[in-house]
Amino acid sequence: MPKLKTHKGASKRFKKTGTGLVVRNRAFGRHILTSKPHKRKKKLHQSVVADKADQKVLKRMLPY
């Protein structure tokens, strides 16, 4: 069986935790920040666990 290749786009956007969950960064936190409240901007810089529906696909994209 051939080696599994890591999806490079996914590897730059997602990280695997020690328990096997996939973590992602939030969107909308890079620019046009003047109209967003401080509380929202703080939350946008926290990483979150990826959606349950996407976990199976992401685990296949990030085999190692």
From Swiss-Prot:
A molecular-function term among this protein's GO annotations: structural constituent of ribosome
UniProt keyword annotations, A-Z: Ribonucleoprotein, Ribosomal protein
Pfam families with a match to the protein in the record: Ribosomal_L35p
GO biological process: translation
Stored PROSITE patterns: RIBOSOMAL_L35
Superkingdom, taxonomy of origin: Bacteria
Gene Ontology CC terms, in alphabetical order: large ribosomal subunit
InterPro entries xrefs: Ribosomal_bL35, Ribosomal_bL35-like, Ribosomal_bL35_CS, Ribosomal_bL35_sf
Family: Belongs to the bacterial ribosomal protein bL35 family.
Name of the protein: Large ribosomal subunit protein bL35
Organism: Solibacter usitatus (strain Ellin6076)
